[in-house]
Amino acid sequence: MSCFDLCRPCGPTPLANSCNEACVRQCQDSRVVIQPSPVVVTLPGPILSSFPQNTLVGSSTSAAVGSILSEEGVPISSGGFGISGLGSRFSGRRCLPC
């Protein structure tokens, strides 16, 4: 690092090396790169809202419960004859309930 001497001479060279003026020495500027430290930013999460509604859903047809269906009040079991048996029983009639 080099410095510049800004002291002025005190006039004619005295026999005793003394001076009453201030003497300042200035050095070159220093450059320092400061990396920013990691910053943690917390973003708020989404706000989930629900609006529950009490709704009744009904049907006028019979519902399937387990493996037993009802056709005109007579219980039908799917065990033994499978879907093909249901098809032959209801062929030509109305659709099966959903």
Swiss-Prot record:
Q: Which GO terms describe its molecular function?
A: structural constituent of cytoskeleton
Q: Which UniProt keywords apply?
A: Keratin
Q: Can you tell which superkingdom this protein's organism belongs to?
A: Eukaryota
What the entry lists under Pfam families is as follows: Keratin
InterPro entries the record matches: Keratin
Coiled coil (UniProt feature)? none
Any one GO cellular component localisation term in the record: intermediate filament
Q: Assembly state and interactors?
A: The avian keratins (F-ker, S-ker, C-ker and B-ker) are a complex mixture of very similar polypeptides.
State the family it belongs to. Belongs to the avian keratin family.
Q: What is this protein called?
A: Feather keratin 3
- Native source organism of the sequence: Gallus gallus (Chicken)
The root-end lineage is: Eukaryota, Metazoa, Chordata, Craniata, Vertebrata
